[in-house]
């Protein structure tokens, strides 16, 4: 069974909390470079992130952001699958969102108790603007390969050990009860920032159903985004 965009988006976001630093133990080859690349992504003032399902070639998610002079994060997020389109947009002062299966957008007003939690900045970043979106677990790598490319970029490939992942990560993964296989490729640009991340594998959900994961995240226009058109359509009337 192929994963839907909704599950994959949730999986990537949930994987963000599973970073293991390696503590005082030795870390796999390339780990420090990947860790630094993630940290540099965390410091970007703007950029774009695209998620693609490599099995179908479909674009599952598009996210773009920039930080304005007021330290407000302006961003647009759109994710789609067979159940519809999910979206979020912030102009820095207002937050809009659209649920899958719904035609109209909604706005979180200043009267809403969650209003402040939906205003983002350079330090309080939207999840897809955080380096932790690129999964990295230094304690569960079974095999590692690092390739230095002619243009100064670096490719780090990890084959994760499912048994170690099941021991170290499953308890923290929403909707995943077991890993069968997982591999990851980290493409690091010559400036040290992460340029792309590919993740393939097979996992079981909470009901025991087995599903494949085959996604690619690509970063473009790092510190080169200065304007983001609003995707917000018709708003639902507030009663």
State where each predicted segment sits:
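N-terminal leader/targeting segments and the immediate start of mature chains
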Residues: 18-70, 224-239
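A structural detector for short beta-strand units
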Residues: 59-63, 83-87, 182-184, 213-217
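Short, solvent-exposed coil/turn segments at beta-strand boundaries
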Residues: 41-47, 64-75, 88-96, 151, ...
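Gly/Pro-enriched, hydrophobic low-complexity segments
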Residues: 152-233
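Beta-turn initiation residues at beta-strand->coil junctions
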Residues: 51-56, 76-81, 97-101, 198-204
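Sec-dependent N-terminal signal peptides of Gram-positive bacterial secreted proteins and lipoproteins
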Residues: 3-26
């Amino acid at each position: 069974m192929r994963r839907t965009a909704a599950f994959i988006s949730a999986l990537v976001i949930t994987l963000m909390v599973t970073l293991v630093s390696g503590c005082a133990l030795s870390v796999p080859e390339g780990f420090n470079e990947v860790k630094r690349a993630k940290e540099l992504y965390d410091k970007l003032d703007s950029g774009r992130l695209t998620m693609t399902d490599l099995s179908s070639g479909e674009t599952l998610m598009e996210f773009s952001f920039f930080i304005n002079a007021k330290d407000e994060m302006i961003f647009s997020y759109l994710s789609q699958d067979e159940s519809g389109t999910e979206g979020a947009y912030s102009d820095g002062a207002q937050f809009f969102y659209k649920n899958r299966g719904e035609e109209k957008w909604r706005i979180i007003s200043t009267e809403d108790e969650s209003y402040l939690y939906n205003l983002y900045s350079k330090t309080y970043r939207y999840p897809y603007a955080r380096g932790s979106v690129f999964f990295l677990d230094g304690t569960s790598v079974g095999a590692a390969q690092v390739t230095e490319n002619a243009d100064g970029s670096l490719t780090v490939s990890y084959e994760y050990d499912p048994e170690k992942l099941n021991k170290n990560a499953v308890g923290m993964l929403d909707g995943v009860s077991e890993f069968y296989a997982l591999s990851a490729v980290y493409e690091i640009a010559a400036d040290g920032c992460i340029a792309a991340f590919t993740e393939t594998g097979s996992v079981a959900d909470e009901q025991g159903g087995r599903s494949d994961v085959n996604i690619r995240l690509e970063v473009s226009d790092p510190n080169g985004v200065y304007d983001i058109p609003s995707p917000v359509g018709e708003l639902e009337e507030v009663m």
